[in-house]
């Protein structure tokens, strides 16, 4: 005998039967099964889902003489996707997570997107892993580079008076004031504190 099982994440319909022994009712994993009649030995039955759900596994099975099925029951799931992951320091735009819908990822200021920006929901799964938002490393400014050189010259000198003299000469040469030095040091301090908190 041959059966058709129609599923809508909950409902399954059984058609036709014979009189010899019975197999356990076919189950759609994660769903409930309602059968109109028992499944008998040598009966073949097929699973079929409505358009808004899909199943993974074989779409048919048969009841054997030892009252087991030829194949395992399929797993049924919605074609729609769950909410996507939100990357740290980022967000996505799109509120529809139905099959065929698309979302777009963005990053906060000072971060860049690494990975796929646009993702689509296809048969209950997003097309790729969520992207990440990576901090953009700022290139040092010329004044900061000159300040670094001045600090290195200060550290290399073994005599304090000579070190201070070299340091101030470098500052004057690069047109740096003590106010700019102070500001640069405060920025470095803030960056170090931020790194320590991560």
From Swiss-Prot:
Domain of life from the UniProt record: Eukaryota
Pfam families reported in the protein's UniProt record: Sushi
Protein's cellular compartments: Secreted
N-terminal signal peptide: 1-17
Record domain Sushi: where: 22-77, 79-135
Xref: SUPFAM superfamilies: Complement control module/SCR domain
The UniProt record lists the keyword Signal: yes
One Gene Ontology term from the biological process aspect of the record: complement activation, classical pathway
Residues that carry a glycan: 42, 59, 66
Keyword Transcription found: no
Gene Ontology CC terms, in alphabetical order: extracellular region
Major localisation: secreted
Keyword vocabulary terms for this entry: Complement pathway, Disulfide bond, Glycoprotein, Immunity, Innate immunity, Repeat, Secreted, Signal, Sushi
Disulphide bridges, residue numbers: 81-121, 107-133
Subunit structure: Disulfide-linked complex of alpha and beta chains.
Protein's job: Controls the classical pathway of complement activation. It binds as a cofactor to C3b/C4b inactivator (C3bINA), which then hydrolyzes the complement fragment C4b. It also accelerates the degradation of the C4bC2a complex (C3 convertase) by dissociating the complement fragment C2a. It also interacts with serum amyloid P component.
Protein name: C4b-binding protein beta chain
């Amino acid at each position: 005998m041959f059966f058709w099982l129609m599923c809508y994440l909950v409902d399954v319909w059984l058609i036709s039967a014979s009189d010899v022994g019975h197999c356990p009712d076919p189950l759609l994993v994660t769903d409930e099964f309602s059968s109109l009649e028992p499944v008998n030995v040598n009966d073949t039955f097929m699973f079929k889902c409505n358009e808004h759900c899909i199943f993974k596994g074989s779409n048919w099975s048969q009841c054997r003489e030892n009252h087991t099925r030829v194949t395992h029951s399929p797993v049924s799931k919605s074609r729609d996707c769950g909410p996507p992951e939100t990357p740290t320091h980022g967000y996505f735009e799109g509120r529809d997570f139905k099959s065929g819908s698309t979302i777009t990822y963005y990053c906060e200021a000072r971060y860049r997107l690494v990975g796929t920006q646009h993702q689509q929901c296809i048969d209950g799964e997003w097309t790729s892993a969520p992207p990440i938002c990576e901090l953009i490393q700022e290139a040092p400014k010329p004044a900061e580079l000159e300040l670094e050189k001045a600090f290195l010259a200060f550290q290399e000198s073994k005599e304090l008076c000579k070190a201070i003299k070299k340091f101030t000469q470098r500052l004057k040469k690069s047109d740096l004031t003590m106010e700019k030095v102070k500001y640069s040091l405060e920025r470095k301090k803030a960056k170090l504190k931020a790194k320590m908190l991560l």
